[in-house]
Amino acid sequence: MKFGVVVFPGSNCDRDVAYVTRDLLGQPTRMVWHQDTDIADLDVVIIPGGFSYGDYLRCGAIARFSPVMQQVVEHAQKGKLVLGICNGFQVLTEAGLLPGALARNRDLHFICDRVPLTVESTNSLWTQAYNPGEVITLPIAHGEGRFYADEATLSEIEDNGQVLFRYAGENPNGSLNNIAGICDRQGNVLGMMPHPERASDPVLGGSDGLKLFQGLLEKVVALA
């Protein structure tokens, strides 16, 4: 399985993601510059966290127009896998690949912490290695992570089972329905504010995030 990690000006978690996919999982991984227009060789595209284009206008608003993003949209439309982490989640909502939006945190402060999450659904390839209702711990680091959607969109997301992760216990940023991560209706595109790549190597204090990536590989082996 070949991974691609998109690099925008201002990305700062791209090497962390590549460390997980290339070094921990031993999978071929390519760094994809934001001006690239050929990603046909990739099975999985990951848009990492950071501050793409300095978060000018609003988070993800400029990155959405990068040449590579049209290719990412087409990649997703083919049913291929896409993951957006933190700023990557914001980019995916701006690009229309995921519903809703990410607004300023409720208290208007940047939050950096480890938080418990409940795995709401394992119907997506992204969460198949977890158990429904499992509580995991992942780091968060964001100033604009409050998930928002209008009432109709929120109801649709809930009814379709698109919420994959919720904040367990205290809601750190005011996200509606404690939403921490959602997928598209097909389940191949995932956006999440917590950072699974920062909880993949036990040396960092936890490895709950590694299963997110391992589940994909296990599925490929099962189908081989």
UniProtKB/Swiss-Prot annotation:
Just give the chief location class.
cytoplasm
Subunit structure comment from the entry:
Part of the FGAM synthase complex composed of 1 PurL, 1 PurQ and 2 PurS subunits.
- What pathway is this protein a component of? Purine metabolism; IMP biosynthesis via de novo pathway; 5-amino-1-(5-phospho-D-ribosyl)imidazole from N(2)-formyl-N(1)-(5-phospho-D-ribosyl)glycinamide: step 1/2
One GO cellular component assignment for this chain's record is: cytoplasm
- What's the gene? purQ
Q: Which NCBIfam families match?
A: FGAM_synth_I (TIGR01737), PRK03619.1 (NF002957)
Q: Write the Enzyme Commission number(s) for this entry.
A: 6.3.5.3, 3.5.1.2
Q: Which SMART domains match?
A: GATase_5 (SM01211)
Q: What is this protein called?
A: Phosphoribosylformylglycinamidine synthase subunit PurQ
Q: Which organism is it from?
A: Trichormus variabilis (strain ATCC 29413 / PCC 7937)
**The organism's taxonomic lineage, starting at the top:** Bacteria, Bacillati, Cyanobacteriota, Cyanophyceae, Nostocales
Locate the transmembrane regions by residue number. Answer: none
